[in-house]
């Protein structure tokens, strides 16, 4: 199996080289029809637009994006061409929750704010927002949610 991988994805080498026969690392902006022509799979980020102009006539059957969003993948073309794709929903949610927790502790330490007297508003209660809400509640913070 030949896989073309965006060279800016951290820690990918250890994982992919165990399962692929051939791996080529390239900057995401440098993926060309010639580069992907005989690849079986692509592992990308948002810098690589996966559409007909890149994929037509290639052997690509699988695309993985190391991102939450997938607007850089032409999903209609993939469906038409029989290409399976996946994204990484929630891949940064724990990090965001940890960052917010740290920021709240800094507010408490530098401004003397009491966490159990705070109210936090969260707009968007998907994977990230719900983890931030859980952290805030555990710290005794009143949480207000909006998910329209």
Where are each of the predicted segments found?
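Short beta->alpha connector loops
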Residues: 7-10, 27-30, 45-50, 68-70, ...
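Hydrophobic beta-strand scaffold residues
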Residues: 23, 84-85, 143
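Phosphate/diphosphate ligand-binding glycine-rich loop within oxidoreductases
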Residues: 41-112
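Rossmann-like dinucleotide/phosphate-binding beta-alpha-beta segment
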Residues: 112-148
